Structures are given as structure tokens and as C-alpha cells.
Amino acid sequence: MSRIGKLPITVPAGVTVTVDENNLVTVKGPKGTLSQQVNPDITLKQEGNILTLERPSDSKPHKAMHGLYRALVHNMVVGVTDGFSKTLEMVGTGYRASVEGKKLTINIGFSHPVILEAPEGITYETPNQTTIVVKGSNKQQVGNLAADIRAIRKPEPYLGKGIKYQNEHIRRKEGKTGK
């Protein structure tokens, strides 16, 4: 058994999981609706509020798919109940961010501000001028958007200036030594 795939998924109250004939899993909850196409080899069984995934054989591809789709369905259930968030910090003089509606404006040392529009289901928050919080119900979308924001100005190794994840450790380098 796949260590991850064999774990059952507990579906909380207020969340409905439906599987159609094409193996499209749809999860509805208080924070929205998410859908994921599951490989036809993987079968989903729901008994009460427990959801389990099963595979046809112990071949390597089936084991891999078993764990993958179990994790994806579990992330959908967590996403529609609690949601996901990624926090980014900006380090540098004059670096700041602000939110106006669904637009995030970042001043990060360029000659122009960088403006990012939030896609459907994603919200931005700025608790202070140097912190950005990306929230949403789709874990992959939140992570990709946070990575895109970080890629605007990655932390550099000499001074540590740039955009980094909250608990990310930046490996620092020593500068040149004089003669």
C-alpha cells in the first residue's frame, strides 16, 4: 500500500464530495467548489463521512497515482473548509506593497510599480507594508501565485534584499575582502 494513498479522508460536516461517471471529483464546501479529474484506474469509495481511494494493482505507476490523487482530493477538502495561505516578506529599503480591491501593487525598486490582479478565488492581504498574504481554497493556485510574486525580485545572497517566504532561510554569502 502507498503510505499516503491508504489513509482515509475524513469529510467534515457541510462538505459534499461527488464523483461522476468520468471520474471527475467535485468538492463543495463553505469556501467554494473545487474539481479534479482522477485517473480512471483509481476508484473512490465513500462510506458515511469517510472517503477512501483504491488502486487495481501494486504496480509502480498505480502506487504513485494512488498517493497523488489521495493528496489532491484531501487538499481539495481542506481547501473548501479552511483554505490555504502563503505569507511573503519584503526585505529592502523602500520596498512596500498595498492592496486596492483585487489588485496588489508592489513597489520593489523598479522604475514602475508592479501590479498583479488576483485570479478568481484568490485574495491578497497586506497586514503591514512589507508583508503579503495570499489566500485561497486551491492549494496549487495559492502556491503558484506566491512563487510568481517571489520571482519578481528573489532574495539576493549578499544583502538578503528581495521577496522571500515567511520562514525561508536565505543562504548568505560573504562579500569580497580587501587587500
Segments the model singles out, each with a brief description of its role:
Residues 2-66, 70-147, 151-179:
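N-terminal intrinsically disordered, cationic/polar leader segments
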